[in-house]
């Protein structure tokens, strides 16, 4: 997708190109030092000679487009969803020349007609992406988004006709937050020109009950993300290593990417709804940091008495490392 996708066959071209650049750099350096010729003169001469090669010309074009794409991508906001503003469902279609499109009308704005600009929709919001036809125009990487509301595909990457749909039914918390990231990106980078009267807006341009429901799910996902961030600070993930016979988990003062003053001991942290677990490093001395009622009665057991924790089988309660048997 626009933010982070590259065609797989680009990897081979990149490898060849980097090898060529390395060889060219060595050659230019040798010529400059041996014959006291300026760097720019040598480069321009070699460029003229190599322009006769179709591979060289195509590689230059590929590198130029890749650099342009990279600069386009770095403008996308970082994915710290809890810091992004909530999506405002209200779009004033009566002001600023905004329009209410039917899905059929929006289809005419897929970039294939010279008489019409290129539009796309996400969560029913229609954006003018005509200024970036190198991405959204016919035959380009993201043309499948043009002329339609393909909200679901922005996060699933399913570009079949069944996947290029507006529905968000069944999407996970992370996928819903990804959609919010995309809306934030398009709000910042492209003009909002209207809405599409379909799943998220009615024929008067007013938000539907479906949009209200989706935004409520997005907010719930955001709260879940915040709670996860807090949980990671309280119960950092364990270090781990695995092989065909099993593996081991252990704790350190930097395990899970969370730097702290204590290492802790490994425990199963149970998610009560799904009963799934992950390995967590648990503070095992002094006052607890989780705030759970069960740990407040002890002043020197850390969070060991938290109700969502279990011991690993055949592992000492005081051990800093536990074996995992496959």
From Swiss-Prot:
Chain ranges of the Cytochrome b5 heme-binding domain: 98-197
Domain of life where this protein originates: Eukaryota
Keyword Signal: yes
Compartments reported by the entry: Secreted
GO cellular component: endomembrane system; extracellular region; membrane
Keyword Signal: yes
Disulfide bonds: none
InterPro entries per record: Cyt_B5-like_heme/steroid-bd, Cyt_B5-like_heme/steroid_sf, MAPR/NEUFC/NENF-like
Pfam families xref list: Cyt-b5 (PF00173)
Signal sequence annotation: 1-34
Keywords, sorted A to Z: Secreted, Signal
Domain observations: The cytochrome b5 heme-binding domain was proven to bind heme, although it lacks the conserved iron-binding His residues at position 136 and 169.
Task performed by this protein: Heme-binding protein.
Protein family (similarity comment): Belongs to the cytochrome b5 family. MAPR subfamily.
PANTHER family listed in its UniProt record: MEMBRANE-ASSOCIATED PROGESTERONE RECEPTOR COMPONENT-RELATED, NEUFERRICIN
Protein name: Neuferricin homolog
Organism from which the protein derives: Caenorhabditis briggsae
């Amino acid at each position: 997708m626009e933010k982070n996708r590259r065609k797989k066959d680009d990897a081979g071209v990149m490898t060849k190109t980097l090898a060529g650049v390395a060889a060219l750099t060595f050659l230019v350096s040798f010529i400059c030092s041996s014959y006291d010729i300026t760097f720019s003169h040598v480069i321009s001469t070699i460029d003229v000679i190599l322009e006769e090669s179709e591979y060289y010309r195509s590689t230059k074009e590929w590198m130029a487009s890749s650099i342009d794409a990279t600069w386009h991508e770095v403008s996308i906001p970082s994915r710290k969803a809890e810091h992004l503003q909530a999506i405002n469902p209200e779009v004033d279609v009566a002001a600023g020349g905004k329009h209410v499109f039917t899905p059929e009308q929006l289809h005419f704005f897929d970039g294939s007609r010279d008489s019409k600009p290129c539009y796309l929709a996400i969560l029913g919001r229609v954006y003018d992406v005509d200024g970036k036809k190198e991405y959204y125009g016919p035959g380009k990487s993201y043309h499948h988004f043009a002329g339609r509301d393909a909200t679901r595909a922005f996060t699933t990457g399913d570009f079949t006709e069944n996947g290029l749909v507006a529905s968000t039914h069944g999407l996970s918390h992370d996928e819903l937050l990804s959609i919010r990231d995309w809306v934030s990106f398009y709000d910042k980078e492209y003009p909002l020109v209207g809405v599409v009267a379909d799943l998220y807006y009615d024929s008067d341009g007013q938000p539907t009950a479906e949009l209200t429901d989706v935004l409520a799910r997005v907010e719930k996902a955001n709260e879940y993300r915040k709670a996860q961030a807090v949980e990671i600070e309280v119960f950092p993930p364990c270090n781990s290593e695995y092989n065909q016979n099993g593996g081991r988990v252990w704790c350190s003062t930097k395990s899970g990417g969370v730097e702290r003053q204590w290492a802790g001991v490994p425990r199963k942290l149970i998610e009560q709804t799904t009963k799934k677990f992950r390995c967590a490093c648990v503070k095992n001395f002094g006052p607890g940091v989780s705030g759970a009622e069960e740990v407040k009665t002890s002043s020197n057991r850390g969070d060991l008495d938290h109700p969502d924790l279990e011991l690993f089988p055949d592992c000492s309660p005081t051990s800093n490392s536990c074996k995992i048997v496959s």
